[in-house]
Amino acid sequence: MKLAICSGYFNPMHIGHLDYLQSAKDLAEKLFVIVNNDYQVSIKGSTPFMSEVDRVRIISTLECVDKVVLSKDLDDTVLKTLKSILIQHQACGRNSFIFCNGGDRGSENTAEEYFCDNNNYY
């Protein structure tokens, strides 16, 4: 089974996010979404529009999303959460995985892309 993982603040959720998540689901059988936590919103410098609880609840109602995970990271990445999901995914004998970034990311590599590149994930 191929797993796609997306992450985002979704603060607030908008149509671009929906397109991003639906496109990611088209690439895999399952879609997991990591929602950045309230602490990460504060260190990003964003104004909290919705709480992490509300953002998780909204994302979990989307038909294209199979599982929502609240980020446990305390920096501006989702590396700890991503690694945790991958360990569980591989423990079930699955190793096909895609990490998807939204269109608002620049051409520079994110920490997550660097991790995936160095571990032969796509």
Identify the role of each PLM range:
Residues M1-Y122:
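Nucleotidyltransferase catalytic core that binds NTPs
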